[in-house]
Amino acid sequence: MILEHRKQEERREDHSKRVVKERQLEANLSCEDRIERKRLLRKLQDEEYGKQIEESLLRAEEDKLFRERQLEQEERMAKELARINNEKLRDEKMRQYIKENSVELRELELKLKSAYLNRERAAQMAEKEAMRYETLREEAMIARTMRDEHELAEMEKEKLEQKKYEEVVRYQQELERQLEEKERKRQEAYEEFLKEKHMVDEIVRKIYMEDQMELQLQLDKMKATQRYIEDFKKQQAEWRRMEREKVEAENRRIIEFAQYQQRKEEDRMAKVREREQAKETLHKMLSEQIELEKQQREKMERAREELCLEEQAEAARQQEIEEMEKRIRQRLELQQTQQEMMAFKKLRLQEEKEEEEAFRQMMMAKFAEDDRIEQMNAQKRRMKQLEHKRAVEQLLEERRQQYLAEQEREEQERAVELEREAQRRKIIEEERQRLLKQHATKLLGYLPKGIFKEEDLEHFDEDFKSNFKQRQADIFSDEGWGDDSQ
């Protein structure tokens, strides 16, 4: 389009130049040459008009050709797009049909679903285990709280008993202080008595010194006083004996009370030891019971898990057996179909040979009958027979060519079927790789054995490869330990 536009511009410029040139020529021409100039000008105009008409026709033809080429190109592009869309749609339909009817993909999907179930079951078991540990922790906290409260109550009780014991000690000390106070007062009374006695002795001595004459009287008085003193000493001795007995009795009561307190303290400590022993025994029994229940729960969980795994394995084995029986039946049916096809083909070949022979005999008989009807001579009859034979051979050759064409068509159909089977296997493998890439990273550690081929790991990153190999090594090591323990 740009080239045509440029050509038109050039043509307009040439035309303008020619017009200017013509006008200049007209201006320079003399009057007597005006007619000639007009004639020449008309001729030039006619030529210019003819050129314009020719150029218009050429442009119209070029535009037509351009539109035709553009239309053809658009039609080719539309056909190509339609072909691509049809192939894409056909490929999608084929993929969808293969995905829905492929035994391998159904087995892979069942294995992936089983892996998801295993992961969900493991998560549920982990959650149950966490809940069980949380329950045990709460029970341990409750037992610890009860033990702390019991110890606090025992401490409070011990404090009360200690307080009572301290009060008893204070009472004993107060009693001893009172006894000491009594002893001090008694000693003061005795000293007062000694002072009085000393005063009496002094009075007696003065009396004795002042009045010897009255000695006999005073002697009697002194005897009386002596008796009084002896009575006083006897009373004092009796009072001291009674005080001593009282103190001894008080000491015995204090000792008995102390012994009673000691026995009570020993009984309390024995009860505390018995309670501690009973508490330890109860704690040990609870721990053993909790451990036994834990082992029983773990045993039940393992048994349940083993039973579930055995059921899954049995279901998988049953499914594999059913699929194997199905494949065997399909293979037997295919073999039977092939045998029937071979027998049918053999029978058809035999029938075709018989039909050819019957057709040959029929044609020869017909030709012979025609010959007899025409009552030809021997030479013409031989010529006619040769013509008939060539016609029959030509018909047989046409039938052989038709048979070969059918054989070639069957070979082409088998090749197409093989190509279709290869395409189906390719689609199955691509879909299998897609499912593995989509789900394997989420189900690492829960995938069943045999789901991966050796070349499948090449489609994953290094992290997945290392984790997968580590999981496999752990599984093999666990199996080895299990064998050793057995």
Swiss-Prot record:
Pfam families: TPH. Residues 52-198, 230-440 form a coiled coil. Keywords: Cell projection, Cilium, Coiled coil, Cytoplasm, Cytoskeleton, Flagellum, Meiosis, Nucleus. The keyword Coiled coil applies. InterPro entries: MNS1 (IPR026504), TPH_dom (IPR043597). One of its GO terms (cellular component) is motile cilium. It is found in: Nucleus; Cytoplasm, Cytoskeleton, Cilium axoneme; Cytoplasm, Cytoskeleton, Flagellum axoneme. One of its GO terms (biological process) is cilium organization. The keyword Coiled coil applies. Microtubule inner protein (MIP) part of the dynein-decorated doublet microtubules (DMTs) in cilia axoneme, which is required for motile cilia beating. May play a role in the control of meiotic division and germ cell differentiation through regulation of pairing and recombination during meiosis. Required for sperm flagella assembly. May play a role in the assembly and function of the outer dynein arm-docking complex (ODA-DC). ODA-DC mediates outer dynein arms (ODA) binding onto the axonemal doublet microtubules. Belongs to the MNS1 family. PANTHER family: MEIOSIS-SPECIFIC NUCLEAR STRUCTURAL PROTEIN 1. This is Meiosis-specific nuclear structural protein 1. It comes from Danio rerio (Zebrafish). The lineage of its organism: Eukaryota, Metazoa, Chordata, Craniata, Vertebrata.
